Amino acid sequence: MSELQLIITTHGRKDKQLTLESLIGSGLMQRTTLVCPQKEYGYLRSLRDDYNVVAQPDPNWYLPEKRDWVVKEWVRRGHDKIVLLDDDLRFSTRISKDDWHLRPITGKELAAEFQRLEDKLGPEFPHVGFAQRQGNNTIEEVGWKTPGKQVCMMAYYLPIVAKEVDWGLVVCRGDMCATLQLLLKGYPNAVLTETCHDQREFDAPGGCSRYRTVEMLNSEAEKFVNLFPGYASIAKKEYNKKTSKSDKKDSAIRLELIVQWQKALEEGTRVRKDKQ
């Protein structure tokens, strides 16, 4: 097997490469690639010479289209393990087994955690990742959780994922959609809860915010539920959205997804066994 490749998908955040900053000093830069629109290639290429930059064929792609291309392109390049990363991530880990508080993790210490992902990733667990920071302090015993929710960063074993995931089903929450597709086909994932990630700011300028609206998110949530009846449902959440005036906010209702990951894996395992 080839070494795990780190792929950061980025758009409109040339000066705010938070994920990349966490990797400085990790020894992983040679295996890291930024995938960006052609107009951002020159600037991102000029920042450092120890990572790779690739211009995406279509500058107008939405994130699922870019992820689909990355999966196929890295298969073509002969790789079998990748981790897809959003460009605005920070990483944390438990202070100790007895102290549930989190501390930042970067560089070589973060590299050791990526090695744990690489070691876990393979035919038995073709999709793995770090847990979300939100709610981490409610987990009493940390370690590998199967199944679990994966968003913003997903490590994939390409011989399986490239064949089994359809990235064209939804525009928003494509990471959750990919996880659910794989579980329903009997492929378990593993989420490391000891180390976690979070976004510095939801809907920050650049990235998906250039096309994603509350209306689109809500429409896509309903589409998701219709695609996976019995495994996904909707909960309404009120939050404040920014208006054209930076000092003023409007209240909006966003439809959040509730996904039954365990039920999906149990059904997928049964179906997969029946086919064998």
Predicted feature locations:
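C-terminal catalytic/acceptor-binding lobe
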Residues: 2-4, 14-15, 170-172, 176-276
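Short loop->beta transition adjacent to catalytic acidic/histidine clusters or analogous donor-positioning motifs
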Residues: 2-5, 24-34, 50-52
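Short, well-formed alpha-helical segments that are part of the catalytic scaffolds
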Residues: 5-27, 40-46
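Short, hydrophobic beta-strand segments that form beta-sheet elements in well-ordered domains
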Residues: 8, 30-38, 128
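Short, solvent-exposed loop/turn segments at secondary-structure junctions
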Residues: 13, 88-90, 133-136, 196-198
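A structural signal for short, well-ordered beta-strand segments and their strand-loop junctions
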Residues: 34, 81-86, 126-131, 189-193, ...
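Active-site-proximal specificity loops/subdomain of glycosyltransferases
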Residues: 35-85, 90-105
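Conserved catalytic core of nucleotide-sugar-dependent glycosyltransferases
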Residues: 92-176, 184
